[in-house]
Curated annotation (Swiss-Prot):
Gene Ontology molecular function terms on file: DNA binding; type II site-specific deoxyribonuclease activity
Top-level taxon of origin: Archaea
UniProt entry keywords in alphabetical sequence: DNA-binding, Endonuclease, Hydrolase, Nuclease, Restriction system
Catalyzed chemical reaction(s): Endonucleolytic cleavage of DNA to give specific double-stranded fragments with terminal 5'-phosphates
Keyword Coiled coil attached: no
Upper lineage: Archaea, Methanobacteriati, Methanobacteriota, Methanomada group, Methanococci
Protein name: Type II restriction enzyme MjaIII
Similarity-based family: Belongs to the DpnII type II restriction endonuclease family.
Short name of any one Pfam family annotated for the protein: DpnII
C-alpha cells in the first residue's frame, strides 16, 4: 500500500440519487399532522381573522401543536425576547381546552411571526403543501448525517456480499465488545468500555478478528486531525492488548487533501488505511481472507 495512492484516488462525493431528500421521512411527518393542518386551512382568506382564529382554537385546541412547524421549528416550546426586553415562553403541547388569555397569546404568535398575513392574504393555498415544502427544506440539515450513513451502507453491502461468497467470514454491524463476545466468544480489551465499531469481521479459518471504522470527509476541519489521532492511538492499543485482532480504517473524501499530514502520520504508524477505490480493487477482501 502506498500513501500517495490513497490521496490520489480519493473520491469527490459518495452522494446517490436518494441522498438529497428523505421523502419517506417527510411523508411520515406530514401524515402525523395532516388533519390538524386541514383544520387550520379554514383560516385561509378570512377577513375577520382574529375572531375566526379564536373560534377555531376554542373548538380545536389541539391545532396549536402544529404551530411551530409552520415557522420551521421542531420544538414544542419557543422562547422569545419581547418588546419589554423580557423573555416570553410559549408551549405548544396538546391541550383539551384553551382560555381566552391563552388564545390571545397564540394569536400574538401568529400575528408577530407573519403567519396571520400568510393565511389572511392567501399567500398560500394549502397548509399541507406548505408544510411539505418546509419539511423538505428542514431535511437538508440532515444531509451531513446522511453522508456518514451512506459511507456505512456502501461498505456494509460490500462486506455482506463478501461474507456470502466466503463462508469462513462472518460480520457484525455496529459491533460492541459484548456483541463480539456473545457471537464469537472473543474477549476484547478496548480503550473505552462503550467503544463501538462500524463493523467487526471474523475469519473462522484463521480465527482473526478485524475491527473496522468508516467515514467520509468532503470538506476540511479540525475533525479530520482529531480522527486521525484517535485512530492512531486506537490501533496501537488494540495491537498491544489483544492477540489476532487487527484494526482497519476505511476513509475517503477530498477533505483529506487539507489534512494530509495527520493521515500520513497514522499511515506511517501502521494503521491499515483504505479508501473506497482500494476496497473496490479487492484490498479489503485480500486482508480479510488471507
Amino acid at each position: 500500500m502506498n500513501f500517495e495512492y490513497i490521496i490520489n484516488s480519493l473520491l469527490e462525493t459518495i452522494k446517490t440519487y436518494n441522498f438529497f431528500v428523505d421523502w419517506e421521512k417527510i411523508e411520515n411527518n406530514i401524515k402525523k399532522i395532516e388533519k390538524r393542518l386541514h383544520i387550520l386551512n379554514y383560516l385561509i382568506g378570512k377577513e375577520n381573522f382574529k375572531e375566526e382564529f379564536f373560534e377555531l382554537l376554542k373548538e380545536y385546541p389541539e391545532v396549536i401543536t402544529v404551530f411551530p412547524i409552520l415557522i420551521a421549528v421542531r420544538d414544542n416550546k419557543i422562547t422569545i425576547l419581547n418588546e419589554n426586553m423580557e423573555l416570553e415562553t410559549l408551549e405548544f403541547k396538546e391541550k383539551k381546552y384553551l382560555t381566552d388569555e391563552e388564545i390571545e397569546r397564540y394569536y400574538k404568535f401568529f400575528k408577530e411571526t407573519g403567519l396571520e398575513d400568510l393565511l389572511k392574504n392567501r399567500k398560500i393555498k394549502n397548509l399541507v403543501d406548505y408544510v411539505f415544502g418546509v419539511e423538505v427544506g428542514m431535511d437538508t440539515n440532515a444531509r451531513k448525517n446522511r453522508i456518514g450513513d451512506l459511507m456505512e451502507n456502501i461498505v456494509k453491502k460490500y462486506i455482506e456480499n463478501l461474507c456470502k461468497q466466503n463462508k469462513n467470514l462472518d460480520y457484525i454491524f455496529q459491533a460492541t465488545k459484548d456483541k463480539i463476545k456473545q457471537k464469537w466468544g472473543i474477549n476484547l480489551t478496548l480503550d473505552k468500555t462503550n467503544r463501538k465499531f462500524d463493523f467487526a469481521v471474523f475469519n473462522k479459518n484463521t480465527k482473526k478478528l478485524y475491527l473496522i471504522e468508516v467515514n467520509f470527509y468532503s470538506g476540511g476541519g479540525s475533525k479530520l486531525k482529531a480522527t486521525a489521532g484517535e485512530y492512531r492511538s486506537l490501533n496501537e492499543f488494540i495491537k498491544n492488548n489483544n492477540n489476532n485482532v487487527q484494526f482497519i480504517w476505511i476513509t475517503d473524501g477530498k477533505g483529506w487533501n487539507t489534512a494530509k499530514n495527520p493521515l500520513k502520520e497514522s499511515f506511517n504508524s501502521g494503521v491499515v488505511i483504505l479508501n473506497l477505490k482500494m476496497v473496490k480493487e479487492g484490498l479489503l477482501k485480500e486482508i480479510l481472507t488471507q
